[in-house]
Swiss-Prot record:
Official protein name in the record: PX domain-containing protein 1
Domain (PX) ranges: 1-134
Family annotation (SUPFAM superfamilies): PX domain (SSF64268)
Stretches of the chain forming a coiled coil according to its record: none
GO molecular function: phosphatidylinositol binding
Taxonomic lineage: Eukaryota, Metazoa, Chordata, Craniata, Vertebrata
Gene3D superfamilies the record matches: Phox-like domain (3.30.1520.10)
Entries under InterPro entries matching the protein: PX_dom_sf, PXDC1
Length: 231
């Protein structure tokens, strides 16, 4: 299963000031044609730098697990935190726009947690650029100039040109992901929501390009000034 790979953090004395979910990319992550959905996240840091990240539902689930492992004495408090409920809400969302909004709500809750957690190595590493982010950064992405019929929080709307990760012959695989077989004691049902790749229900209709980019706006929100860009 593809995943963003996190190996420590170089973001010393920095923290995430804000984050927004721009959309979803459905990427081919194996030569067998297996696909996985990645949320594109725009992050603004304390030094005013901006990073675009791509994280899957499984990555979000592992972040929660790593927080619990990093702060074992605070596990009861973390279980009551919005993170667990947010993960379940994302898993249960059957509408794409609702799912994107739930992901954004969850990420904002994470960076709003007490500094002990929000500025911990676990959280900063999650928001650090991964090898997958670097690969996708070089992808040709069309920036669409938009007008809005109703207030929208997203500041930048983008659409992919059908990028396929397998075409680059670069597949990022995290072999260190625990399979859960060695866990003992009481098991939280939420921990198993993200096993097996954290698959989400397919929202694309028949005939749609499976690699198409889905923005955090409905068709009625998006009114491009140059419609030929979308042809």
């Amino acid at each position: 299963m593809a995943s963003a790979v996190f190996e420590g953090t170089s973001l010393v004395n920095m923290f995430v000031r804000g984050c927004w979910v721009n959309g979803i990319r459905r990427l081919v992550v194996s030569r067998r044609g297996d696909e996985e959905e990645f949320f594109e996240i725009r992050t603004e840091w304390s030094d005013r730098s901006v990073l675009y990240l791509h994280r899957s539902l499984a990555d979000l689930g592992r972040l929660w697990q790593r927080l619990r492992d990093a702060f074992p004495e605070d596990r009861p408090e973390l279980v009551r935190a919005p993170l667990r409920q947010g993960l379940i809400a994302i898993k249960d969302a059957h509408d794409i726009e609702t799912r994107l909004n739930e992901v954004e709500k969850l990420l904002k809750a994470i960076i709003s947690m007490p500094r002990k957690y929000s500025r911990s190595e676990v959280v900063l590493t999650f928001f650090e650029r991964s090898p997958l982010d670097q690969v996708l950064k070089n992808d040709n992405v069309h920036k669409i100039q938009c007008g809005f019929q109703s207030p929208v929080k997203i500041s930048e709307i983008m659409r992919s040109n059908g990028f396929c990760l397998a075409n680059t012959e670069t597949i990022v695989i995290d072999h260190s992901i625990p399979n859960g077989k060695d866990q003992h004691g009481a098991v939280d049902p939420a921990e198993h929501l993200f096993e097996g790749g954290g698959e989400l229900p397919a929202e694309l209709e028949d005939g749609d390009d499976p690699a198409a980019y889905v923005t955090n706006l409905s068709y009625y929100h998006l009114v491009p000034f140059e419609t030929d860009i979308l042809d």
